[in-house]
Amino acid sequence: MCKAIEHRGPDGTRTMIRDSVAFGHTRLSVIDTETGWQPLINEDESIFVILNGEIYNFQSLRKELEAKGHQFRTASDTEVIVHLYEDEGLDFVKQLEGMFAIALWDESNNRLVLARDRIGKKPLYYT
């Protein structure tokens, strides 16, 4: 699957495979070119996220989350999604401003979350 879309992300490909889910991501490095690889994983490896797009308000969201005690390992807008989901649950998407398609795997709850921006600017494909 990643091979079919590698032209959309020429800077590298990564995958994550678990018993009941597999994520593939091809990267176009824009924000945090060194550590912003996806799927991005939280500290206890229970939440995985892939983002296609850009979260415009990620810096203000990051400051709010840091004030609540969340610690970040990257400068990526994608990592904000992981922490926001930990904090807000399924309501995390209501806080996001930008153009995006998100796939998030919550290993603890065996839950796949798919979300797009309100306009649907970014495509979201799944099989």
Predicted regions and their residues:
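N-terminus-centric sequence/structural signature that marks the extreme N-terminus
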Residues: 1-127
